[in-house]
C-alpha cells in the first residue's frame, strides 16, 4: 500500500507537525548507591509533608512480627517435647521464613478489610484548573500497534473533552526492534495524528537502540524532553486510564508539592483465556484488600509498579537516575526491575511516594497462560533478585528496603516452600524407615522415643491456613456484604461458586508456579540472563508437544514426590495430594487455562466474572471499537521496499525517524552498523540489498536516514549480475 492508496494518508507532510517536539535537554545523572548525594533528603515544602504515622506501621508490621513469633514458638513446641533434631531445626527455620512472608500480607489484609468496610471514596480536590504540564508516556516494545495506538487515541479524545486536555501531551516511546512492527507503528501513528491533531498533542519516537530497556526508554525521554514537563504519567502498552483518573492524578500532584510519585492500583481487564479470567477475578475480589491495606500503612513510603502512575519530573530526573551495577547479568549490568528502585530513590531524596488506593479508573491486562506468566516471571525474578544488590544502598527508608525485600521474597519463597515440603517429607520417611535409638548412652530407666505434639501441630496447621487464605476470606466477606458488588459479578450464588472454583484451580496451578519459580531462581544463580522477549497478550494456546516439553520436569517432580510419600503411607500421600495433583496434570491444566475457547465457555456461564467485564467502563468499550478500526487502517502493511520506491512514503517515514545524531564523532562503530554499511555500500540495486539484510539489520536501516537515502538512490530492478555474495 502506498501513500496515495489510502485517503487518510494522502499527504507528504506529517499531519500535526513534527513527530516529536523540540528538545529541551536536562540532566539525569546515575545515582550513587554507596553514599547519600549532597542536598538529600530535601526539605519538605509543607510541614510534615513526607512524614508517616508510626502507629500504622506498629499495627501492621508489629502485628505481623508478633503473629510470626507466636507461630515460630508453636512450631518449636511441636518438636521440643522429645528434643529437636538437626532436621527439625531446618524445618523450623524454613517455616519461620515462610510464615513471616504470609503474616505481613495477612496483617495488611486486615487493615485493607477494615478500610473497605467503610466504602471509602476518592478524595475530591476540587481543582478547577491545571496550571502544570504532564507528559503521558506509552512505552512499547514489539507490541501490536493497533492495541497501543487505539488506546492512546481513545484516552486522548476523552481527556480533551474534560477541558483539561491542554495540560497534557501524549508520547508513544517505541523500543521496537521488528522492522515490520516498526512500519506498522508509523502507519498507526499517521492515523492517530489524523484523528487527534485538532484536540491533542500526540508524538511518536522509536529509539535506534533500546539501551537499558524500558527504564532506558523513559530516561532517554527525560534527558531530551523531560524539562518541558512538570509531571510524567507512565503507562504500559496494555494500559488504559479514564480521563477522570488522569486529571485526578495531575490534580493530586499539583496540590501536593512534596509528592514525588503517586501510584494507582490497576484493575485487570480484557482477559479471554481461562488463566486470564482467573487472574482478573482474583485481583478484583482479593486484590483491593491487600492493595488498600498496603497503601494505608506504607503511607508516604509507597511503591512504584512501573506503570499507571504519575511522577514529578524534578524528583525523577534529580533522584532516580539508575546506575549500572558492577558485573555481568543476571546480577550486574542494567537494573531490570527499575520501578521498585526508582520509588526507593525518590523517597530517599525526600519526596513522598503514595499508593492511591482510593482512585479508580486505572486498567491493565495480564498474561493469557501459565507459560506466558512464566516468561514474564522469569524476567521479573531476575530483576527482583538483582535488588539484593540495591538493599545496602545508603539512605534508603526502611520501608523502601522492605519493599525490595518483599519483591525478592516473591520469588525466593518458592524455593523455601519446596525445601519445607522436602524436609517435612524427609522427617516422615525418617520416622518410617530409620529405627529409633530407644536407649542412649546416658542411663535411663525409660527409652527415648522420637515424639512430637500432634495436637499442637494440627492447631498450627489450621492457623497457618487461616493466615494464608485470610486475604481471600476478607475479599469474599466484602463481596457478600455489598449487594451491589455481588450483583456486578453475577449475584452471590455465582460469586461463591466462582470463589470455590478459583481456590481449587489456583491450588492446582500453585505447585506448577512454585517449580517454575524454583527453576527461574536456579537459572539466575547459574548466571543465565533472561533477555527481553515481547509479551503475548491475547491467545495463550500452544501445541501439546510444546506444553509437554515445558512441563516435563514438573510432572516428573510430582511423580517422584508422590512415590516418596506412598513409601511412608497412603495417609501422607493424601495429605500431599493437593500439591501433587496439579503437577501430575500440569500439561492439560496449562492447555485448558491458556485456551480462549474454554475462557469463552466460562464467560458465557458467568463464572469468574468481574464488574469490569459485565459492565465495562465506557473507555474500555471505546478502546475495543477503536482497536478494530485501527486493524482495518493498517491491514495492508508497508514494507521497506515500498518505502524505498515511493518518495512520498519515504518523506513521511523520515519525518518520523528519531532526530538524535546517529553517532557522536570519534566514537567507535558497532559491529552490526559496520556490517550494514558494507552491505548497503556494495549492493547494486535495492532488491539485492534487501536480500542480504536480516530483520535486525532492516530495523537499523529504517532508523538511519543516511542509509535510507543511499538505498533510495539505487535502482529498484533486480538482475542476476547484481548479486553480492558474502561468506
UniProtKB/Swiss-Prot annotation:
Pathway(s) it belongs to: Glycan metabolism; osmoregulated periplasmic glucan (OPG) biosynthesis
Keyword Disulfide bond (UniProt): no
Main location: membrane
Gene Ontology BP annotations: glucan biosynthetic process
Region feature (Disordered): 18-38
Keywords, sorted A to Z: Cell inner membrane, Cell membrane, Glycosyltransferase, Membrane, Transferase, Transmembrane, Transmembrane helix
Transmembrane segments: 58-78, 97-117, 278-298, 408-428, 460-480, 496-516, 572-592
UniProt keyword annotation of Hydrolase present: no
GO molecular function: hexosyltransferase activity
Enzyme Commission identifier(s): 2.4.1.-
Gene3D superfamilies hit by this protein: Spore Coat Polysaccharide Biosynthesis Protein SpsA, Chain A (3.90.550.10)
Membrane topology listed for this record: Multi-pass membrane protein
Cellular compartments per GO CC: plasma membrane
The family this protein is said to belong to: Belongs to the glycosyltransferase 2 family. OpgH subfamily.
UniProt-listed PANTHER family: CELLULOSE SYNTHASE CATALYTIC SUBUNIT A [UDP-FORMING], GLUCANS BIOSYNTHESIS GLUCOSYLTRANSFERASE H
Physiological role: Involved in the biosynthesis of osmoregulated periplasmic glucans (OPGs).
Protein name (database record): Glucans biosynthesis glucosyltransferase H
Amino acid at each position: 500500500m502506498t501513500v496515495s492508496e489510502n485517503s487518510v494518508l494522502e499527504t507528504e507532510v506529517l499531519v500535526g507537525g513534527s513527530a516529536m517536539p523540540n528538545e529541551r535537554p536536562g540532566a539525569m545523572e546515575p545515582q550513587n548507591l554507596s553514599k547519600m548525594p549532597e542536598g538529600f533528603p530535601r526539605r519538605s515544602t509543607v510541614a510534615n509533608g513526607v512524614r508517616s504515622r508510626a502507629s500504622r506501621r506498629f499495627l501492621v508490621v508489629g502485628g505481623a512480627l508478633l503473629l510470626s513469633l507466636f507461630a515460630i514458638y508453636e512450631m518449636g513446641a511441636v518438636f521440643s517435647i522429645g528434643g529437636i533434631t538437626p532436621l527439625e531445626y531446618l524445618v523450623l527455620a524454613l517455616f519461620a521464613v515462610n510464615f513471616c512472608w504470609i503474616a505481613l500480607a495477612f496483617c495488611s489484609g486486615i487493615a485493607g478489610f477494615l478500610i473497605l468496610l467503610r466504602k471509602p471514596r476518592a478524595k475530591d480536590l476540587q481543582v478547577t484548573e491545571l496550571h502544570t504540564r504532564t507528559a503521558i508516556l506509552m512505552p512499547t516494545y514489539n507490541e501490536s500497534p493497533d492495541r497501543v495506538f487505539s488506546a492512546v487515541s481513545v484516552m486522548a479524545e476523552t481527556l480533551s473533552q474534560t477541558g483539561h486536555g491542554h495540560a497534557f501531551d501524549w508520547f508513544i516511546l517505541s523500543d521496537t526492534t521488528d522492522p515490520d512492527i516498526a512500519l506498522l507503528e508509523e502507519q498507526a501513528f499517521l492515523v492517530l495524528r489524523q484523528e487527534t491533531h485538532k484536540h491533542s498533542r500526540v508524538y511518536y519516537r522509536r529509539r535506534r537502540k533500546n539501551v537499558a530497556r524500558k527504564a532506558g526508554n523513559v530516561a532517554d525521554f527525560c534527558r531530551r524532553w523531560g524539562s518541558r514537563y512538570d509531571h510524567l504519567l507512565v503507562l504500559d502498552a496494555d494500559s488504559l486510564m479514564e480521563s477522570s483518573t488522569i486529571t485526578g492524578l495531575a490534580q493530586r500532584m499539583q496540590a501536593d508539592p512534596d509528592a514525588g510519585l503517586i501510584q494507582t492500583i490497576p484493575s485487570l481487564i480484557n482477559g479471554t483465556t481461562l488463566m486470564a479470567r482467573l487472574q482478573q477475578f482474583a485481583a478484583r475480589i482479593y486484590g483491593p484488600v491487600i492493595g488498600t491495606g498496603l497503601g494505608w500503612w506504607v503511607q508516604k513510603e509507597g511503591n512504584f509498579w512501573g506503570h499507571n502512575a504519575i511522577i514529578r519530573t524534578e524528583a525523577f530526573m534529580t533522584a532516580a537516575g539508575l546506575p549500572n551495577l558492577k558485573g555481568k547479568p543476571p546480577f550486574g549490568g542494567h537494573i531490570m526491575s527499575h520501578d521498585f528502585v526508582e520509588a526507593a530513590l525518590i523517597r530517599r531524596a525526600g519526596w513522598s511516594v503514595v499508593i492511591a488506593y482510593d482512585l479508580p479508573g486505572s486498567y491493565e491486562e495480564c498474561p493469557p497462560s501459565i507459560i506466558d506468566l512464566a516468561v514474564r516471571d522469569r524476567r521479573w525474578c531476575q530483576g527482583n533478585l538483582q535488588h539484593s544488590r540495591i538493599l545496602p544502598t545508603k539512605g534508603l527508608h526502611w520501608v523502601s528496603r522492605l519493599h525490595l525485600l518483599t519483591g525478592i521474597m516473591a520469588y525466593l519463597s518458592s524455593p523455601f516452600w519446596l525445601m519445607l515440603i522436602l524436609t517435612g517429607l524427609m522427617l516422615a520417611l525418617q520416622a518410617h524407615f530409620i529405627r529409633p535409638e530407644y536407649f542412649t548412652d546416658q542411663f535411663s530407666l525409660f527409652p527415648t522415643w522420637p515424639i512430637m505434639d500432634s495436637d499442637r501441630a494440627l492447631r498450627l496447621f489450621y492457623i497457618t491456613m487461616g493466615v494464608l487464605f485470610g486475604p481471600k476470606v476478607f475479599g469474599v466477606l466484602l463481596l457478600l456484604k455489598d449487594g451491589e458488588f455481588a450483583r456486578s459479578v453475577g449475584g452471590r450464588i455465582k460469586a461463591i461458586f466462582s470463589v470455590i472454583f478459583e481456590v481449587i484451580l489456583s491450588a492446582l496451578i500453585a505447585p506448577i508456579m512454585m517449580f517454575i519459580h524454583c527453576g527461574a531462581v536456579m537459572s539466575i544463580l547459574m548466571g543465565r540472563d533472561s533477555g527481553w522477549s515481547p509479551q503475548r497478550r491475547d491467545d495463550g494456546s500452544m501445541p501439546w508437544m510444546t506444553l509437554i516439553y515445558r512441563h516435563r520436569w514438573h510432572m516428573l517432580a510430582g511423580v517422584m514426590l508422590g512415590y516418596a510419600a506412598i513409601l511412608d503411607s497412603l495417609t501422607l500421600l493424601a495429605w500431599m495430594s493437593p500439591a501433587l495433583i496439579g503437577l501430575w496434570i500440569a500439561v492439560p491444566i496449562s492447555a485448558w487455562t491458556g485456551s480462549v475457547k474454554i475462557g469463552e465457555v466460562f464467560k458465557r456461564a458467568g463464572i469468574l466474572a468481574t464488574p469490569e467485564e459485565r459492565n465495562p467502563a465506557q473507555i474500555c468499550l471505546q478502546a475495543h471499537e477503536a482497536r478494530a478500526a485501527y486493524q482495518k487502517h493498517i491491514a495492508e502493511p508497508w514494507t521497506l521496499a515500498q518505502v524505498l520506491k515511493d518518495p512520498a512514503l519515504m518523506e513521511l517515514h523520515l519525518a518520523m525517524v528519531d532526530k538524535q545524531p546517529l553517532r557522536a564523532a570519534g566514537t567507535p562503530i558497532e559491529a552490526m552498523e559496520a556490517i550494514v554499511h558494507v552491505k548497503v555500500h556494495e549492493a547494486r540495486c535495492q532488491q539485492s540489498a534487501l536480500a542480504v539484510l536480516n530483520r535486525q539489520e532492516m530495523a537499523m536501516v529504517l532508523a538511519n536516514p543516511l542509509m535510507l537515502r543511499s538505498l533510495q538512490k539505487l535502482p529498484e530492478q533486480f538482475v542476476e549480475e547484481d548479486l553480492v555474495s558474502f561468506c
